[in-house]
């Protein structure tokens, strides 16, 4: 007598379907017991998938996953999209009822003639800043502050009221929620300690103090070396930008601010990369501004422009690979200022220094072809200008010559010889004034570099 829930007759029916006739009762009973064990095993594994999926209903997907776990080919044609429908088949009188699964009939001709489905898109990944220095940037990928606030209140709802809550919280505890009495405060980007606030005030006041040089140097040294200033970095960048705009007539303060930018860039503990876009306008202002300082006859602004050009080179070399449009934009700004005849020579000087920091190819491609045209403006100033204008024009010519030194030929002068008409070719390339200056210096390496 079989102790399984499976009828021996069912086993014999399946055997006959497979072409096995006259199956004895003993092997049929053994197969029935093994079948019961296998089904229990599959259901047990499928239940694990159901529990891990946090569901209370067993689905055909769980059965398929269990079969794959047991290294058995899963059943095909069964899915969770529609429920299984069993129909009773007509059998003879006195026989047990027979039920079968009502499968949907599929027309092969219709499937063959149907259009192919669309090809799915390729898998792609995109990166964005989740947070920068503890601040979530306002980009489409990140939730807005309003969404965050609404989601926070929706999640609280009627559950969990903080101790010491107001009347609105008591109403929420009783199941009544009202948003009318809720005051939504703006998000605070940074919460600075009193020590950091005091440090910021002392540093900024020391940098703007023109009388105490020692205190100013100590402040710059602190900005260059202290490791715990990352929270203050955005405030220092904002202070730098505002102070440059307000102190264009004070060379001492502007020079100090450029040294401040240098100190922030030199500090190995600060991550300046996210603030390059806010830092560049201040540096470019000190580089190509029409007038720096209150006295037009004070030539110390040239040293400030040299310092700004030096900082410009540091920023472009360090962050040019991250911001791939940084160098082209800076080059375009400097070239536009250099070629604008309405700009003063002080702006031209800063533009030439800025183009020099862009490297050898920028000088060869952008500066050299325009020297001969620029000479027309310089020659007119040398002939009809006053003493101050002549001085500024000569400073620009000196800056151009200094930029051309980047084009020196690396080979030794005795390894190559100059063409017989070197002077004429040089004058044709860079104009008579610059050619005369170069020939006077007798720099053979520079001559070879310009005549390539």
Swiss-Prot record:
- Which PANTHER family does the record cross-reference, listed alphabetically? TRANSCRIPTION INITIATION FACTOR TFIID SUBUNIT 6
Q: Give the UniProt entry's GO cellular component terms.
A: cytosol; nucleus; SAGA complex; transcription factor TFIID complex
Write the signal peptide boundaries.
none
Biological process (GO) annotations? Answer: RNA polymerase II preinitiation complex assembly; transcription initiation at RNA polymerase II promoter; transcription initiation-coupled chromatin remodeling
UniProt KW Oxidoreductase keyword: no
Function in brief? Functions as a component of both the DNA-binding general transcription initiation factor complex TFIID and the transcription coactivator SAGA complex. Binding of TFIID to a promoter (with or without TATA element) is the initial step in pre-initiation complex (PIC) formation.
| Cell location | Nucleus
Q: What happens when the gene is disrupted?
A: Cells lacking taf6 are not viable.
Q: Which domain of life is it from?
A: Eukaryota
Protein name (record) = SAGA complex/transcription factor TFIID complex subunit Taf6
Recorded domain comment: The histone-fold domain (HFD) is required for interaction with taf9.
Q: What family name appears in the similarity comment?
A: Belongs to the TAF6 family.
What are the recorded GO MF terms, alphabetically? protein heterodimerization activity; RNA polymerase II general transcription initiation factor activity; transcription coactivator activity
**Chief place where the protein resides:** nucleus
One Pfam family, short name please?
TAF6_C
Q: Which UniProt keywords apply?
A: Nucleus, Transcription, Transcription regulation
Assembly, per entry:
Component of the 1.8 MDa SAGA (Spt-Ada-Gcn5 acetyltransferase) complex, which is composed of 19 subunits tra1, spt7, taf5, ngg1/ada3, sgf73, spt20, spt8, taf12, taf6, hfi1/ada1, ubp8, gcn5, ada2, spt3, sgf29, taf10, taf9, sgf11 and sus1.
Q: Which InterPro entries match?
A: ARM-type_fold, Histone-fold, TAF6, TAF6_C, TAF6_C_sf, TAF_TATA-bd_Histone-like_dom
In the record, what lineage is assigned to the organism producing the protein? Eukaryota, Fungi, Dikarya, Ascomycota, Taphrinomycotina
Q: Which residues form the Histone-fold domain?
A: 4-68
